């Protein structure tokens, strides 16, 4: 059987839905117009099928990479999208690429070292904003000797 562009689009849409959630994908599709429909099809096929379907990395690792890269590049809208959808992802579904607060913290600490403290700082602020919006505000933590390294 020949793999068609439509097959790739179906797989890409499935990956997008697993990682970003049905609601976000439906909103994105609803915004398609004569200017951007080919772009939408291209990213769905190339990025969401061609890249996100590759066997070399699991989806959680890919999402972590997206967070680090988007923070390093200052692509805060995409960063926030992956923070939010990662926190909302089903923790029992590894294909949904769920994230926890500790992982987000580690990504941003690493990003601050390699991409600069301002990127880490902005990423922390956005992550905290999303956590608060989701009702998952982190508890206060000690800043002194009891703070973890």
Which residues are covered by each model-predicted region?
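Amphipathic alpha-helical interaction elements
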Residues: 17, 53, 70-71, 96, ...
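Substrate/cofactor-recognition hotspot
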Residues: 117-121
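Acidic, glycine/proline-rich low-complexity segments that act as flexible tails and inter-domain linkers
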Residues: 1-60, 83, 88, 95, ...
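Short alpha-helical scaffolding segments that buttress acidic/His motifs in well-ordered protein cores
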Residues: 43-47, 64-69, 107-112
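Helical "substrate-binding/catalytic lid" subdomain
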Residues: 57, 61-64, 76
């Amino acid at each position: 059987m020949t793999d068609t562009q439509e097959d790739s689009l179906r797989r890409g849409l499935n990956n997008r839905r697993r990682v970003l959630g049905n609601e976000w994908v439906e909103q994105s599709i609803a915004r398609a117009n004569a200017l951007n429909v080919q772009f939408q099809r291209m990213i769905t096929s190339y990025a969401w099928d061609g890249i996100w379907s590759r066997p070399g990395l699991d989806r959680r690792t890919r999402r972590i990479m997206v967070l680090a890269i988007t923070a390093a590049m200052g692509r805060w809208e995409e960063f926030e999208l992956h923070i939010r959808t990662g926190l909302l992802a089903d923790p029992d579904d590894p294909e949904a690429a769920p994230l926890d607060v500790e992982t987000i913290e580690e990504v941003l600490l690493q990003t601050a070292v390699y991409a600069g403290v301002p990127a880490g700082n902005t990423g922390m602020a956005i992550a905290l904003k999303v956590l608060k919006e989701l009702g998952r505000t982190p508890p206060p933590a000690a800043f002194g000797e009891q703070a973890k390294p």
